[in-house]
């Protein structure tokens, strides 16, 4: 035990209440002032409440504000003004500044051919606007008028240079229609191993029950014809990610897997990445835009999987760290080069 700790042991059994009872009123008031200054929230109070009383003297008389103002005004009038040390004589020194006159250059008289003179004399405002745009006199018009005149083969600024610029009218773009896929029918076809079913697209269907998605992943284990499996924006979470991981361990025909824009956490992504190592047919994997950032460990695992799986040639994820991003880019370049060499053979 150090000397400082031994010194503190003396004050452990002290009765604070007994000490406070023995203090006089003056000592208690002084202690209160010291504690107020030590309070960390004391600086948050206004100055009038933060400062303690500076004096305890009683007032010598009542305060009359009007009498005080009259006294100060009378005293100010009775005080004699001081004379200037250096009296002002009114003498002006120096010369006043006169701005020199600038010579206005004479405008050059430009003579045009009679045909051009006649054409410009009878040109309308719309034609003059297009002529100004062709001559790069863009300061006379707005940007819209300038580019419309250059890009169009006809006179488009029909109201002239001083016209009010109207906004462009864009064609309304309708929303994309909902996904027409019948989930129950797709599930039956996957279970029956339909030869004509090569793509399962359930994108943007957000009301799929979790048990049905789990059954679909279970049926995909034995399917040998489906090449593309997409679950984008289906509100899938970690249970679906674990089902997809189990499917990847047994399926040997799937080539493209897309689970972007879902609610999969780092645990679910880690399970999918571990299952990708055991799959030799998958060539495309997309896992970007999840609800939460997966973390540095998952990004390092992604780079490791791409280095150990030469079959993956397309990977969809936006890395936030420079190290995994560089490793993943190098691995993808190597995998695509290997695929190109295999096609040559």
Curated annotation (Swiss-Prot):
Gene Ontology terms describing biological process: actin filament organization; muscle contraction; myofibril assembly; pointed-end actin filament capping
Transmembrane stretches, by residue range? none
Q: In which tissues is it expressed?
A: Highly expressed in skeletal muscle.
The GO terms describing molecular function are:
actin binding; tropomyosin binding
Q: Does the keyword Cytoplasm apply?
A: yes
Domain of life, source organism: Eukaryota
Task: Cite the residue spans of the region called Disordered.
Answer: 42-63
UniProt GO cellular component terms: cytoskeleton; myofibril; striated muscle thin filament
What UniProt keywords are attached to this protein's entry? Answer: Actin-binding, Cytoplasm, Cytoskeleton
SUPFAM superfamilies reported in the protein's UniProt record: RNI-like
Where does it reside?
Answer: Cytoplasm, Cytoskeleton
Q: Does the keyword Coiled coil apply?
A: no
Q: Which PANTHER family match?
A: TROPOMODULIN, TROPOMODULIN-4
Per UniProt, subunit arrangement is: Binds to the N-terminus of tropomyosin and to actin.
Describe the task this protein carries out.
Answer: Blocks the elongation and depolymerization of the actin filaments at the pointed end. The Tmod/TM complex contributes to the formation of the short actin protofilament, which in turn defines the geometry of the membrane skeleton.
Q: Which family does it belong to?
A: Belongs to the tropomodulin family.
**Protein name, UniProt field:** Tropomodulin-4
Organism of origin is Homo sapiens (Human)
